[in-house]
Amino acid sequence: MTITDLVLILFIAVLLAFAIYDQFIMPRRNGPTLLAIPLLRRGRIDSVIFVGLIVILIYNSVTNHGALITTWLLSALALMGFYIFWIRVPKIIFKQKGFFFANVWIEYSRIKAMNLSEDGVLVMQLEQRRLLIRVRNIDDLEKVYKLLVSTQ
């Protein structure tokens, strides 16, 4: 097993840990989930480049009769990338005392102001940064508003 194989195993393990945390652990942290809203995906060009480069590496490994374990590890990495970028749905998860946005816990007390832009983006102003929340379905913003009013 080469250093390349070890690095590939490390990347696969990190992506797998992230997928398990995002799918199973995060919704159970900090109390019961009150509301989970699917968000719009960001640009997919990065994911196309990532998976495309891995496919090129797989092709190169196969045509040059590279190590079989490396080819399988590259395939597993491509599948993990495909899952993370295309199958997994990003979401905002509201709890009793705060919410998870981009896998970061934010308490309601940190929200200084909220605005709704014309194109349906909810803007939350925190102490030092702004969160731009782009929901998949515009009607979900009403659910978020009702939840935030009831918890504040």
From Swiss-Prot:
Membrane topology field: Multi-pass membrane protein
Transmembrane segments: 6-26, 45-65, 67-87
InterPro entries: DUF986 (IPR009328)
Highest taxon of source: Bacteria
GO cellular component, one term: plasma membrane
Pfam families, sorted: DUF986
Principal location listed in the UniProt entry: membrane
Keywords, ordered alphabetically: Cell inner membrane, Cell membrane, Membrane, Transmembrane, Transmembrane helix
Entry's localization field: Cell inner membrane
HAMAP family: UPF0266
Family label: Belongs to the UPF0266 family.
Protein name: UPF0266 membrane protein YobD
Annotated organism of origin: Escherichia coli O127:H6 (strain E2348/69 / EPEC)
Lineage, highest ranks first: Bacteria, Pseudomonadati, Pseudomonadota, Gammaproteobacteria, Enterobacterales
Gene designation per UniProt: yobD
